[in-house]
Amino acid sequence: MLIKKEAIILRDLEAVFNIVNRVDFYKNFVPYCIESEILSEENEQMIAKLNLNIKGLSTSFTTKNLVKKYSSIDMQLIEGPFKYLDGKWEFKEIENTTIIFLTIDYKAKNKLVEYAIGKSLEKITTSLVHAFVKEANK
């Protein structure tokens, strides 16, 4: 299933990119995220893990993120409740305003996961983007 979101943030690209790229701070402002950590970071690659609680269901997933500074972050599932999950953040700056684009393509491992998480993922993704907008505007 493919989900696409975008938002305009009245902040410069560097500030917005740094907020999105600081996975270890997600637990402080991202809905449903109860723990977030960077497991490793080297050159343009980051391994990150998120623990989520969605409708009382706790789950976690780990991604390998290819970071192109101030341009994009490509995410690929390493471990989690999905058969696959690929995502991409893209950043575009226009006169000290940043447009963020988030694309997530995923398939749940089974019907229980699809029911519990999949049906909510569209709302979760919207909440996620709104959380980044709010955090950037602080």
Residue ranges and their predicted role:
Residues 1-43, 96-99:
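Hydrophobic ligand-binding cavity/cleft-lining segments
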Residues 13, 33, 42, 58, ...:
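Solvent-exposed, flexible loop/coil residues
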Residues 105-138:
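A conserved amphipathic terminal alpha-helix motif
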Residues 27-28, 53-99, 105-107:
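Hydrophobic-ligand binding "helix-grip"
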